[in-house]
Amino acid sequence: MKTKLATMAVAAVMAAGPVMADLVFPSLSYRTGPYAAGGIPFADGYADYFTMLNERDGGIGGIMTKVPECETGYNTEKGVECYESTKGQGALVYQPLSTGITYQLIPKATADGIPIHSMGYGRTSAANGDVFSNVFNYPANYWNGASGAINYLMSQGDIAGKKIALVYHNSAYGKEPIRTLEELAKKHGFELTMLPVDHPGQEQKSQWLQIRREKPDNVIMYGWGVMNQVAVQEAANIRYPMEDFIGIWWSGSENDVLPAGDAADGYKALTFHGVGNDFPVFADIQKYVVDAGNAAGAGDQIGTVLYNRGLYAAMLAAEAAKTAQEIHGTADITAAMMRDGMEALEITEAKMAALGLPGFGPEFNVSCANHGGPGLVGMTQWDASAKTWSLINEFAPSDMDVIQPLIDEDSAAYAAENNIASSCK
């Protein structure tokens, strides 16, 4: 009843009030540089979803949305400049799409009262909303991904005494899962080898020669951009079994496997959202966006992994904005109100189905203490002949007995260093 009344109040305000400014969702994109192949489809999916809401629904709560893009080139300094140049436009939330940029923006955005959603990337301990009041990383983070990979391997057989290699991008991003995997190695008795790959990742011969020599039972990869396709090709060159090779969700797009052709068949990647275009929402994207000539890109990325991820990020932002409108009884929300909407966000299967995205992601609730969601992780596998990803393992829990103490420890250290008081009542 409360929700109904709030929705009616929003509608009443809209009917009686003046024309309001757009709801602004800046896109810190990278359509250029070594990571453009990943940045472009995400930015397209993010923009196209909001365009669909404008064309089909008249925006959110009767207010049109606007997605100003600022090109970062995946460069941290440029990312900060983009934030500074767009925050005054009424920005409601930032999706930096870069762990390096996210780390730099956390203190700035928190001071400015603007929320950050670093979905499946960024600073993992930001899941602790008591410390990171303005940062959210639901529905899953890097440490959930590391645990999800190990849980999947354990579901296939005992991993005690097995050798597992981590091939990782030698950056803040790539180093994120190391501590979690070290703790999981202690807990489950597997041997962990770490193989860093320097930016941008085009040279990996030494790492894969070491893998050929040491013959690990499994390889887990935290890569991005050209690093991924080079790794898949190098694995094929040494005839490493693709079914034993698992990428994090940033190493599991079509870009990463297509260059290797049939040799990539069987490669696996973690995910926290649906794959493919067999969802009703895509008919509306086609009708209101692509066919109408409003697509952010060429319209040929629909249903690809990273387009879907951008669309999913936009959907979660839009649903948080609706929640904020209901909480505050106004359609013309501020960044502070948006933060409240993100913290009260509930994603149910019924809601996803109503949005044309049935089963697209896990059900989850956000709270003051938990900005990270449930950490449910699925597994996908590449079929090279069909050129499709399939979900082979449903969204399943990660080991929070290991992960939560690490989140608590890291966030407590951050709070002490930065003199941050508890934000949850």
Q: Model segments located where?
A:
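N-terminal signal peptide c-region/cleavage motif recognized by signal peptidases
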Residues: 16-18
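Short beta-strand segments enriched in small/hydrophobic residues
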Residues: 22-42, 97, 163-169
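Venus flytrap/periplasmic-binding-protein-like
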Residues: 72, 116-118, 123-127, 200, ...
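Extracellular/periplasmic Venus flytrap/periplasmic-binding protein
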Residues: 78, 124-125, 133-239, 276-283
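Extracellular/periplasmic periplasmic-binding protein-like sensory domains
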Residues: 235-314, 410, 421
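Segments of small-molecule ligand-sensing domains
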Residues: 296-307, 318-393, 398
